[in-house]
Amino acid sequence: MAKSKLNVLISPKAKMACELMEKNLKIPYIELYNSYNPENILQNYEKFSDYMGNRLKFDFEIEINNLDKTIRELKNILKDFPIVLDEEAVLFPYEFSDFLLQNGFNVKKIFATSPKLTDIDYFNNIKKRYKDVKLIIPYNPKQRFAPEKLEECVSIGLESGYLTSSFHNVGLCGEDGLYGFFGLNYILEKILDSYKNKTDLKENIERAGLVV
């Protein structure tokens, strides 16, 4: 790592490390935070191309078409089936929720703390436009016994699955290193898979090596 020419920062958690490497090792970094907004994803790649002196040319026509196809298929199958998610699953839970809501999905609950960085605008938009969505702070010892059970829903993240006792859990943790169009499409495909096939939450938690 000390011989790297460039650090690409995709998570706020790594910013201090990037700053220290820039200061101590003279390794520059560029902020390209992960996003679930197709326009922002394109801007990230354009920004990276600009940084590299326009030596890189990207064509995402196939990826965008695949994403549109996945959204349509998922919407046709899920219809108004409830979706809940948490901040352990994705870096920016409010942005991802906003993406789902904008595409007509029935997001019911978001288990997350205060929004960070680019997530603030999406947080405010959800509060303003989608007043039926419940915003819940998960880190409360009484939360497990709160009336948040919603077994018939797709829960994205182990935490939301645990708190709702969902039968359909997407065992995503820290985005599993996913990024860009591929990452967004992958998450949507996992939502579809979890809807079609009931999941064993206990098995997902044990596979992730977590202690509840």
Which ranges hold each PLM region?
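An N-terminal assembly and electron-transfer interface module characteristic of large anaerobic redox
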Residues: 1-212
